């Protein structure tokens, strides 16, 4: 039977792995971090999470319908969500399908499928898959626009922000009104 690779053990990767396994399709997962959670795992070095982060969509529109969130809080914080994703992965047997601390280093079309090369605790391996799902956290890389001129102060993208202590006693100019920018402006007003 054909197997599929899922790259990333965040919410999208877990949803893809669950959808495939529910249909009897074999799955091997790859995750660069040490555990399930993706960007919701503040301990993941690639995470852009900060201490006060919480859902911006309600719990009932975010949870997986077949596995409701135990929390009754409408907008739970990131630690509740990280645990929820870990519980979901354990409940549906997805955790054991992932190779953690393993990076995908190459993906090449081969024989109607894909050769996937990974590097992790087991060393470097190449395996063939009928298909590959990319759920590798595109938001982990900050998008920092170029500004003309020079600036002698510190520039910090919200992806490097973790807690209010980083900015305590400082004057800050916030550029941008995305979700993170709005959250941080409310924290520091």
Predicted features and spans:
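Glycine-rich active-site loop/strand segments that organize a redox cofactor
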Residues: 39-83
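Beta1/beta-strand and adjacent pyrophosphate-binding region of the FAD-binding site
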Residues: 1-12, 171-175
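Glycine-rich FAD pyrophosphate-binding loop
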Residues: 21-44
